[in-house]
Amino acid sequence: MQTTRIAMEDASFPYRLGTDCAEDVVARLAALEASSYLVVADTTVAELYGAALTAHIDKEAGPSHLLTHEVGEVHKTLATVSALAEQALGRGADRRSVVVALGGGVTGNIAGLMASLLFRGIRLVHVPTTVVAMLDSVLSLKQAVNTTFGKNLAGTFYQPVEVLADTAALRTLPPREIRSGMGEVVKNALAIRPAMLDRLAGALRPDTRYDDETMRWIIAESLAAKADVTSGDKHERRSGLVLEYGHTAGHAIEHASRGAVAHGAGVAVGMTLAAEVSRRLGHADAGLVALHRELVAAAGVEPAVPDHVDTALVKNWLAYDNKRGYLDSPPGHTPMVLLSAPGEVLHTGTMPLVPVPLALLEEVVDESAARGGAGGGAAEPAAARTGPVPDGPEAAVPATPGPVPAGPAAAAPLPSGPAPTAPAAAGPVP
């Protein structure tokens, strides 16, 4: 496996990338000499890879336990984390255990948050199986779950001991999830590494047929892009905020779509909206907007808000974006990452954010939705999935943000798998 050292201020960990390298993955896990390996996966990934991986770990590394959760963003909640932690403790987890996050961004966040909380922190290894996870989410120290107010609002910062990525896992992904990953790749090129735009434009495939060499190049460029903005900002609160490009509207579209729009596809559409907002504010020209739409379309995502997504819900979620508070924005404004040209991020003081009137952003959302028409925008049927967990929502979210008694945390069932075997009163309270 090819190793890249990911360095963010005082945080550092190896990212190991290969193809058809399952034996190397297990060898790296064995080198950690854990008392047990807590493999966290959703039910789809568990069926595809869970039994084989845990059997290999049992043989070569030590005892392993497969802890599963239901598929989808709607299950990325504190309730799921708590249920998995109870299972882990019931199966004998201790301070020398290692949490292995096997799956996409949803699983990575759930497992990462659990690792940060068990015994106030045990070792975490990411084994990503989606494009978004390989080139984006596992490169962040942010481990967060959703609340009824929005995405990723409850969490911690926690560092993995390493990332072990085998691109062979991408072969089982449906086109929807490949396109989702390419949305994040386009973001990296437009906002951080414009030098990769020419090659990327020729490499993008709407049919999602990427060879291993191209995929490894895409992942390597994304690692470099992330390093460009996080090497001095491990918590992504200053220069690292550039990684939020397209996410203000993208998260709102994703959340409001109730599973029809995957995360990266939402970000892709969100970037086209951000480019149009920048143009209307006088910061960018029509050429930048056209470039955004061309690249998003080349990635296989229609560059418009899908016509079946309720724009009223999208506009509702815009007001709850997780970048609130970074700027002292006037009333009726929300902070956004905007570009004036590829790689040219607008700043307010030292912050790569600009306060944008919500009324303007809402107008751009409405116009994009009207343009989406019968084409369906960024949506694809979630039922088309044949591979690992997608990185976007897969089930209903609350119709409007706010404390709803029957919100995701209340509705999410306990993860599948045996209940804790230890008596409720056994052992000291952690």
Curated annotation (Swiss-Prot):
Residue numbers annotated as active site: K142, E244
Binding site for NAD(+): 42, 73-76, 105-109, 129-130, 140-142, 151-152
Residues given in the record as Co(2+) binding sites: E184, H247, H263
Biased composition (Low complexity): 379-399
Role according to the record: Catalyzes the intramolecular carbocycle formation from D-glucose-6-phosphate to 2-deoxy-scyllo-inosose (DOI).
Pathway terms, separated by semicolons: Metabolic intermediate biosynthesis; 2-deoxystreptamine biosynthesis; 2-deoxystreptamine from D-glucose 6-phosphate: step 1/4; Antibiotic biosynthesis; neomycin biosynthesis
A GO BP annotation: antibiotic biosynthetic process
Database matches in Pfam families: DHQ_synthase, DHQS_C
Residue ranges of the region described as Disordered: 371-430
Family membership: Belongs to the sugar phosphate cyclases superfamily. DOI synthase family.
Enzyme Commission number(s): 4.2.3.124
Cofactor note: Binds 1 Co(2+) ion per subunit.
Keywords annotated in UniProt: Antibiotic biosynthesis, Cobalt, Lyase, Metal-binding, NAD
MF terms (GO), sorted A to Z: 3-dehydroquinate synthase activity; metal ion binding
Catalytic activity reported: D-glucose 6-phosphate = 2-deoxy-L-scyllo-inosose + phosphate
Cofactors required: NAD(+); Co(2+)
Species assigned in the record: Streptomyces fradiae
Cross-referenced InterPro entries: Dehydroquinate_synthase, DHQS/DOIS_N, DHQS_C
Record's signal peptide: none
Protein name as it appears in the record: 2-deoxy-scyllo-inosose synthase
